[in-house]
């Protein structure tokens, strides 16, 4: 499917909605792995910039050793972004660069973290969930800001490290508001695929240090994408 800049947004939304509707019944919010066997965790993030009227993006994937938290690999991709930003359909814009970066990996992550949502999405198809079907790996969404769905606000958790409140919409748990660090704003965790919410929370908390409220792989991927964007813009 090739989509050029002269897009018909209505047709794109129809096509993208159809794909999301076909994939969403295949989501499994249960672990397909043993947590003791996790060795490598990847963080994925993207950054964008404009050159004249053309949008460009860069994706960075950082892999850490789950035990030592040391970085074991970093890869990048970059290129033109022909697909416009349409709320609820971010995956279609970001996945080409993500897949290009994944192809460069020499290590095989056991789990991918995404700077964004997974099940916490209008159709349960945030970037973390959508990407799982192409990566064939468990995924977790970690968002810095809250995606408000059906006018439901999140409930602020206690000001204690590890405290959380579930995000419940129409009697269904979509995700979790998690305070990873005391006296710091919470983050929003949601399952991507092939993992449950309690395990997602445990793994996120095991990747928190004193430097950020974000888990280490996500924070490092965020830093690297901004460095790469600066380098590419200056080059």
Swiss-Prot record:
Localization (cell): Cytoplasm
Signal sequence annotation: none
Binding site for Mg(2+): 45, 115
Gene3D superfamilies: archaeoglobus fulgidus dsm 4304 superfamily
Catalytic activity of the protein: Endonucleolytic cleavage at apurinic or apyrimidinic sites to products with a 5'-phosphate
Annotated site location: Interaction with target DNA: 85
Keywords assigned: Cytoplasm, DNA damage, DNA repair, Endonuclease, Hydrolase, Magnesium, Metal-binding, Nuclease
InterPro entries referenced in this protein's UniProt entry, alphabetically: Endonuclease-V
One annotated GO molecular function: deoxyribonuclease V activity
GO CC list: cytoplasm
Pfam families in the record: Endonuclease_5 (PF04493)
CDD domains: Endonuclease_V
Ranges in coiled-coil conformation: none
Protein EC: 3.1.21.7
Cofactor: Mg(2+)
GO biological process, one term: DNA repair
Homology family: Belongs to the endonuclease V family.
Known function: DNA repair enzyme involved in the repair of deaminated bases. Selectively cleaves double-stranded DNA at the second phosphodiester bond 3' to a deoxyinosine leaving behind the intact lesion on the nicked DNA.
Name of the protein in question: Endonuclease V
